[in-house]
């Protein structure tokens, strides 16, 4: 990651292009991945004196769904999901305008987890936590959208919107949104 970032910054410098802000996925997600990404972004912002923009991981996952064929229904809801092991997912319920219907939380998925939404709307589930939940959810209004992962390229429109709106983070005090506390475990194999 460091080499790629260095090359990108060299490209900007060699072409006289300004850097005004750095956007980073702020979570939820992998503890290590979030720490590395946020630390790199904060270092660039501090070193270059530019703004920091944080984009929630689940929101950036919604971009390709909204740009694709789904959802067709005007009142449909979308639910990006990240696998949190076993039958647990990190999920958020959004409308088609990316307005939060239900904030991000850790859900232990059973047949009733999203029933209140499914009884009134078509609901599109996607992300690496969605497939394992579909059999359990089993509702005629539940739809699985496959192949959606959190990709940096989907961050651009959301980061630009935050830039225009002046929604920046404090570089010194910003921390990723882990959702759950980190629990250290002893390795199964000791060296």
Which residue ranges define each predicted feature?
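N-terminal beta-alpha supersecondary unit
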Residues: 1-28
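Acyltransferase
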Residues: 145-191
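Stable alpha-helical structural segments in soluble proteins, enriched in small hydrophobic residues
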Residues: 8-12, 47, 65, 152-163
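Short helix-terminating capping/connector loops at secondary-structure junctions
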Residues: 14-18, 72-74, 169
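Surface "functional belts" at beta-alpha junctions
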Residues: 51-150, 178, 183-184, 188
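DPxDG-like acidic metal-binding loop motif
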Residues: 23-57
């Amino acid at each position: 990651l460091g080499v790629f970032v260095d090359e990108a910054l060299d490209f900007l410098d060699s072409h006289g292009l300004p850097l005004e802000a750095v956007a980073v996925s702020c979570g939820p997600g992998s503890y290590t991945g979030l720490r590395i990404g946020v630390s790199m972004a904060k270092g660039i912002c501090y070193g270059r004196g530019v703004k920091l923009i944080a984009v929630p991981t689940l929101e950036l996952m919604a971009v390709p769904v909204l740009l694709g064929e789904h959802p067709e229904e005007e009142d449909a809801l979308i639910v990006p999901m990240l696998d949190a092991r076993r039958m647990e997912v990190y999920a958020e319920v959004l409308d088609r305008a990316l307005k939060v219907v239900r904030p991000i939380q850790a859900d232990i998925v059973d047949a009733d987890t999203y029933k209140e939404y499914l009884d009134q709307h078509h609901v599109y589930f996607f992300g690496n936590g969605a497939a394992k939940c579909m059999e359990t959810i089993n509702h005629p209004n539940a739809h699985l959208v496959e192949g959606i992962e959190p990709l940096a390229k989907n961050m651009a429109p959301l980061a630009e919107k935050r830039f225009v709106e002046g929604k920046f983070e404090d570089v010194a005090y910003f921390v990723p949104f882990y959702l759950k506390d980190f629990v250290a475990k002893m390795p199964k194999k000791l060296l």
